[in-house]
Amino acid sequence: MLSSPATAATHLVSLSVWGTQGTGVSGHPALGASWGFITFSSTASDLFIGDTNRAEDCFFRDSTTGQLEVLSVSTAGVLGNAKSLKPVPSVNSLFVTYQSAASNLVDGDTNGKLDVFVRDRVNLTTRRVSVATGGGQANGDSTYPQISPDGRYVVFASVASNLAPTDSNALSDIFRHDLLTGVTEHVSIGVNGGPANGVSLYPAISGDGRYIAFQSTASNLVAGDSEGRTDIFLRDMLTGVTERISVASDGSPAERNSGYPDLSDDGRYVIFISMARNLSVGDTNNYNDLFVRDRATGVTTRLTQGIAGAQINGSTISPEISGNGQVVVFGSNASNLVPGDTNGVADVFTVQLATGAIRRMSVSHDGLQHGAERSFQQHISQDGLFVVFSTASGNLDLGDGNGRQDVFLAY
């Protein structure tokens, strides 16, 4: 594995319609196919005229034109009356999903729960998708939405018990909603067709919506799961088969917890973090490392190695893989992934799957690292060339002077 000292070009992107900084906290950024199309949420009330709801809102920004568009509005254009966050766009950025506590984004929202919505940026419509087939409201909170790159499917976690007839466990489960047919399907299903016996979270979806990865404490999703750990699973929605991903190349299960999965568009590569020491030879650092499972070859590889092949001296968090399966972005507080990392806080890095080259992205254009504020909430573009992340550091862009957490684009 190689560590690359190459620096990134970093730009502030959580700006108002006038190109100025807001007075609130901005975060949860995401990218579509284009580096210029960015979604994020913000508590700022001065990003556009008329923001009077005193709540976090979701935005779309075209960095090539400076256009800023509010996403957390009803079809009639009314701002949500409660917090909206975690916007994620389809590849073409025409559809954006997000979660919201607002009750006025669609008619008939009376459940008083966190729901998942999709904003159609072409037709300027807003639709609730955390519903049962037929449109029945969820009786529990729905969170962690992700949208398939083609914009057809949305996956999410929900503690609701009325979204599918197979759900009776009163625990968080994973669901997939088809925007074309309106059908909501239960994803985290046991081997006997019944509900999972544990908590399932953090879904990720392939390009065509066929494969869905998620983490779960359940022991009945696959046969022979008796370790009592949080594992990574992948469900094939076409065949109805679930496989365990957090295993070594010889098929032995991870002996410690694993989490935060993501997968390439074709479903071949699944990434995750794990404390397990048996997924890779020589893993004795007792930190969360980053792994990739190649479903075509059955090989599991550790991606986080430090300078000169050393084990990393910190943990890894929230990885995401580019749609083409070539680059992974992740956060880490390790100080030995690249030379010169002396700030003592979490940074954002990328790793090339083909070469293992690691690059720190959360630096200024001239290579200046940030100070006491961590960088996190990282997201990578479809082609793996661009990264967005959040940080309260004020020295990554000369135009950053608000003293708040902002969103940055790096490449």
Feature locations, PLM:
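C-terminal segment of classical bacterial N-terminal signal peptides
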Residues: 1-6
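Conserved "turn/edge" positions that cap or connect secondary-structure elements
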Residues: 7-411
